[in-house]
A protein has these predicted regions:
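Residues forming the flavin
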Residues: 4, 12-67, 71-354
Length: 354
């Protein structure tokens, strides 16, 4: 297996997209299929498959709060149905499906870091039959939870196992919010893997997908279990300390683990080291690896009573609605931007780095 070789392939499945389907707060689940069929000009029974692609809450008018859905549907004759549909909310749609082929190779790829990037890299490699080895400087999520709680209770900081380092990455303790782009076709696949391992179905279509730390730790544990069941290996409390090269190509790495330092041969190396492994950055910089600074945020947490935010956003308290949120952004002529961030209500000064 050569470095950089794509180990997945995908194919587009033709479906129909129906957008801007309005549901009232008290509508039943069957109403979505009925209204999608109405937009298409067909009977509900003619829809073979319906998948929610996006759901958002329109609360701009507090007297008229409602849900807006986009769904993909499969019918017996898509082309005929599209021609017959008169609604502007109906269009042709391609559902992208990934297929991970099996690859035969005696070489085992090495992944450094077991945060989101490293975890999904190892998951795909495992499903391809490549039995990756993961090197993670922190500890497993259960031990990590104990160390974090001990620190928050006034205990001692473990520099290698804390809210920044360990299985699941820094986001494991940030309430499980999922930040993704909107254009990459791989996003839906990744959300599907979270759902497959225990995340609620709503993350597949909500505009601001959210899991929660209490659920996320179990998901992380489940993904690790699948990787191991497919022949992968996760080495916790193990730190990358050096990279060996020959002729401009990686030939191996140096690792310091619980039982001391050792060398590990490898020709395929994935660095998923996150944003806080500064000693690793220094080592990579010494090897001449190109890198550049990234903008960062710093700030304080603003706490409100959830009932006050619900009242301000919805005009009343609706038990059937999710917790309301808000965001504010203030641009300035300086190099800083002030903004709040989703439900956590973090007020951040973001510095622009040239």
């Amino acid at each position: 297996m050569g470095v950089g070789k794509r180990i997945y392939r995908g194919e587009a499945r033709k479906m129909i997209l129906v957008r801007n389907i309005r549901l009232e707060l008290g509508d039943s689940a069957d109403a979505l299929r009925d209204k999608a069929a109405s937009e298409l000009g067909i009977a509900p029974r003619e829809i073979k498959e319906l998948k929610i692609k996006k759901r958002s809450l329109d609360a701009r008018k507090k007297s008229d709060i409602h849900w807006l859905y986009s769904v993909s549907v499969s019918v017996r004759n898509e082309e005929k149905t599209l021609k017959r549909a008169k609604s502007r909310n109906v269009c042709e749609y391609e559902e992208f499906e990934y297929q991970i082929p099996q690859i035969k190779s005696a070489e085992r790829p090495v992944v450094i870091g077991f945060g989101p990037a490293g975890m999904f890299a190892a998951l795909v490699l495992s499903r391809a039959g490549l039995r990756p080895i993961v090197i993670e400087r922190g500890c497993d999520v259960d031990t990590r939870m104990e160390r974090v709680e001990a620190f928050r209770s006034g205990g001692e900081l473990d520099p290698e196992c804390n809210v920044q380092f360990g299985e699941g990455g820094a986001g494991t303790f940030s309430d499980g919010k999922l930040n993704t782009g909107i254009k990459d076709k791989r996003i839906s696949w990744m959300l599907e893997q979270f759902h497959r391992h225990g995340a609620p179905e709503e993350i597949l279509y909500d505009g601001k997908p959210h899991i929660g730390t209490d659920i996320l730790t179990g998901i992380v544990r489940s993904i690790r279990g699948e990787i191991i069941s497919l022949g992968g290996e996760i080495r916790f409390n193990s730190k990358l300390t050096g990279i060996k090269t020959e002729g401009g190509a990686v030939t191996g790495i140096e690792v310091t683990g619980k039982n001391g330092a050792y060398a590990l041969p490898c020709r395929c190396l994935i660095l998923a080291i996150g944003h806080s492994a500064r000693d690793t950055f220094e080592m990579l910089n010494g090897l001449g690896v190109p890198m550049e600074p990234k903008a960062f945020s710093m700030g304080v947490r603003i706490e409100h009573k959830q009932a006050d935010i619900d009242l301000a956003q919805y005009g009343a308290v609706y038990p059937s609605l999710p917790a309301a949120d808000y965001s504010l952004t203030q641009e300035s002529d300086t190099e800083f931007t002030l903004k709040t961030v989703n439900n956590d209500q973090w007020s951040c000064l973001t510095k622009k780095v040239n």
